[in-house]
């Protein structure tokens, strides 16, 4: 036998020391190639929205209702009803959402995958999803896991006597874990040292792409009593929690200190005080927590469990390991006398008793009603009763002055609690779905809600091809430059976030507060452009018969198209930028200024803009922006080259304008960046700006940013840049730029096929 045949086989594909191990600061271009057809088992022709429309929703709900009380021996239902478990499952699916970047949430069924499937706060939810498998199996691809998790939460509430606000389907599944979500930089579960330290260095260490600054630009930051500030945009106080530690900050049973954490984390999920109180009280009207014994009885989470466990985790060696012996959070609390029926008993108990600190059987801090009778049922033994118990975070609703005022109103007005909880639950579970245009099914509520960023429905004939050609001529004759036209269209459309489907050009909110005043949008120039376009709009609409109109939202995008066509013509290319009318103009009354404010970019590498107080490298924030815009690496690359050629930037900043033919759609950015006759030097120790000097004469030829130079520095981006810098790449560059541009302009056009 040869020595080669005897050689042991000790590795498999993907093993060994990786590029990431060698170069941990390497840019994460892989974030732009997630969720491709290569990971999707469904045919390319599969359309989830169309499949959902064929679903018998009533039949699914009937099956779910039957499941609620069909207790299984392998995981018995508390109080004979799975409703509380499924409410927690749905809540924790949706509750990862944060308004800062729109990431997290229920929209892609990510609770099935790491890390969420193994978070400490999601103990036992593996069993909840496994209980649902027969129903998912029955209806197949007509209902996604993402939709099923939320629908099940609704049915759970309804079977326990609560009237929900509605349900919308339309959440297609993904088939792999999201890699772009920055969950924090702690290395241990339930750690919080980094998010409450100076903040992580963002991608400098962990390769994430999100802004990790703890200070909010130009705003008063929210500090707790110890001066702590939670790192942006995180929505949880510890790694692996959905929101807060129910025992109190770092386990300290202080209801007032806990109230600060509650207010901060719920606000980052776009909830106000009333919604927060309603959600906590409404959710804690049902079920119980689980802490029957010490946590050291609980085995590894699903991602660390042995193969034979088949995706289940947290195997419990305490007693039977289930039912009355269940260990989940380590807390052992049941709030109400009717834990499987809607009531106002949570608030009745909260205010009726004085509360004394005690320990759960697992040793966790919790509270018991002082001198109370044993009125609370046992989850698995009808012969037993217990005293009312509460979490530290429950007591926050009584002892925080603002929460207490709301709580007493709900105590005295149960109908107000029911309405507030129904609305807050709907918002919680639908916040990341985007506009109502994406909502599917017979239970979509008719009421339009401000947090949905409403846009009027089209109520007039749209412009035709002849109108479009005429409007382009008027735009180009208006005196506005190519740069101004393209910059404004980009500013309008590039607010879109693929994470929560918010933003975009539809609605023309760029003309409204707060967008019209954002520094990145150059308010003075923006005002001039909008005034000119509004004049063209007014003249056109006034000359029409039959009610035909062009919206400003459409006209802004059309103006960008006209600018690009003119720039391409100047470069010797005849192109027509595809344009689909149908956008409408939102009003200021339809715009929640604070909520829309979350869309303001801290950086936009496409415009060479970065806020001065941001410490994450601008090139990493470019990847962040591109990922939110659902761009691939080639699309990002060609857009950078085209926008630089068209002189799209902020202010009079010449960075990245590597051309002597500005506002002409050439590949000069790539050709000049890759020119070996240029030597680049940083202009300051911060290394944010660079000068490109002639290698022979030393004279300054260009100035560039980190975002510009990364396209020559990063091996993959350089490879892409070479394609567009090549002699045979000029037409491809124009063609690909137009395609990527149209993609961005239409990202929020959910009405288009």
From Swiss-Prot:
Pfam families named in the record: peroxidase
Posttranslational mods: Formation of the three residue Trp-Tyr-Met cross-link is important for the catalase, but not the peroxidase activity of the enzyme.
Annotated positions binding heme b: 284
The keyword Metal-binding is annotated on this UniProt entry: yes
Crosslinked residue numbers (Tryptophyl-tyrosyl-methioninium (Tyr-Met) (with W-91)): 243-269
Domain of life: Bacteria
EC number: 1.11.1.21
Complex and partners: Homodimer or homotetramer.
Function in brief: Bifunctional enzyme with both catalase and broad-spectrum peroxidase activity.
Name of the protein described by the UniProt record: Catalase-peroxidase
């Amino acid at each position: 036998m040869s020595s080669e045949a005897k050689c042991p086989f000790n590795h498999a594909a993907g093993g060994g020391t990786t590029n990431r191990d060698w170069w941990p600061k390497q840019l994460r271009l892989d974030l732009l190639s997630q969720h491709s057809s290569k990971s999707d088992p469904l045919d390319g022709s599969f359309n989830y929205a169309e499949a959902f429309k064929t679903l018998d929703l009533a039949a699914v709900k009937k099956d779910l209702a039957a499941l609620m009380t069909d207790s299984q021996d392998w995981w018995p239902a508390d109080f004979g009803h799975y409703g509380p478990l499924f409410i927690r499952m749905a809540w924790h699916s949706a509750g990862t959402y944060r308004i800062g970047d729109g990431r997290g949430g229920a929209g892609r069924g990510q609770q099935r995958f790491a890390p969420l499937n193994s978070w400490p706060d999601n103990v036992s939810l593996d069993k909840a999803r496994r209980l649902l498998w027969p129903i998912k199996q029955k209806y197949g691809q007509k209902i996604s896991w993402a939709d099923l998790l939320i629908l099940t939460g609704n049915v759970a509430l309804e079977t326990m006597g609560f009237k929900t606000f509605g349900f919308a389907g339309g959440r297609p599944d993904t088939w792999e874990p999201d890699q772009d979500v920055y969950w924090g930089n702690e290395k241990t579960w339930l750690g919080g040292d980094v998010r409450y330290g100076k903040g992580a260095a963002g991608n400098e260490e962990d390769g994430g792409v999100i802004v990790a600054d703890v200070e909010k630009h130009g705003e008063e930051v929210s500090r707790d009593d110890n001066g702590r500030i939670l790192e942006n945009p995180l929505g949880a106080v510890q790694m692996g929690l959905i929101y807060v530690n129910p025992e109190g900050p770092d386990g300290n049973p202080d209801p007032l200190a806990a109230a600060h954490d509650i207010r901060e984390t719920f606000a980052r999920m776009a909830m106000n005080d009333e919604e927060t109180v309603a959600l906590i009280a409404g959710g804690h009207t049902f079920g119980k927590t689980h802490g029957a014994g010490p946590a050291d009885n609980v085995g590894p989470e699903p991602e660390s469990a042995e193969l034979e466990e088949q995706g289940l985790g947290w195997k419990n060696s305490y007693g039977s390991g289930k039912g009355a012996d269940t260990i989940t959070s380590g807390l052992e609390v049941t709030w109400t006398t009717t834990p499987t029926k809607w009531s106002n008993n949570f608030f009745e108990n909260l205010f009726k008793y004085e509360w004394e600190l005690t320990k759960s059987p697992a040793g966790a801090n919790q509270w018991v009603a002082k001198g109370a009778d044993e009125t609370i049922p046992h989850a698995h033994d009808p012969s037993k009763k217990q005293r009312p118990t509460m979490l530290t975070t429950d007591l926050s609703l009584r002892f925080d002055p603002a929460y207490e005022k709301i709580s007493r109103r709900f105590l005295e007005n149960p109908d107000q609690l029911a309405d507030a909880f129904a609305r807050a639950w709907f918002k919680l579970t639908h916040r990341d779905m985007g506009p109502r245009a994406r909502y599917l099914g017979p239970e979509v509520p008719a009421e339009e809600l401000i947090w949905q960023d409403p846009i009027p429905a089209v109520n007039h004939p749209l412009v035709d091809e002849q109108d479009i050609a005429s409007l382009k001529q008027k735009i180009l004759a208006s005196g506005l430059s190519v740069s101004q036209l393209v910059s404004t269209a980009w500013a309008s459309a590039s607010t879109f976030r693929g994470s929560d489907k918010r933003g975009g050009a539809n609605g023309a909110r760029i003309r409204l507060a707060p967008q019209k005043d954002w520094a990145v949008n150059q308010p003075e120039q923006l005002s001039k452009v909008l005034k000119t376009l509004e004049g063209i709009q007014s003249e056109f609409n006034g000359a029409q018969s039959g009610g035909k109109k062009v919206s400003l939202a459409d006209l802004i995008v059309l103006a960008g198209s006209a600018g690009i066509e003119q720039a391409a013509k100047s470069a010797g290319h005849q192109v027509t930028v595809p344009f689909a009318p149908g956008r409408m103009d939102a009003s200021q009354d339809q715009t929640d200024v604070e909520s829309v404010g979350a869309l303001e970019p801290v950086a936009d590498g496409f415009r060479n803009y970065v806020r001065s107080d941001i410490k994450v490298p601008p090139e990493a924030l470019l990847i962040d922006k591109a990922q939110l815009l659902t761009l691939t690496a080639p699309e990002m690359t060609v857009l950078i080259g085209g926008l630089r050629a068209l002189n799209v930037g902020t202010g009079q900043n010449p960075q990245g304008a590597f051309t002597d033919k500005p506002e002409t759609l050439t590949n000069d950015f790539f050709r000049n960046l890759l020119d070996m006759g240029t030597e680049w030097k940083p202009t300051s120790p911060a290394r944010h700006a660079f000068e490109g000097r002639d290698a022979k004469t030393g004279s300054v030829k260009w100035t560039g940013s980190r975002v510009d130079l990364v396209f020559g520095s990063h091996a993959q981006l350089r490879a892409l840049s070479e394609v567009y810098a090549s002699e045979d790449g000029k037409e491809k560059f124009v063609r690909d730029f137009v395609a990527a541009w149209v993609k961005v302009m239409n990202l929020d056009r959910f009405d288009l096929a």
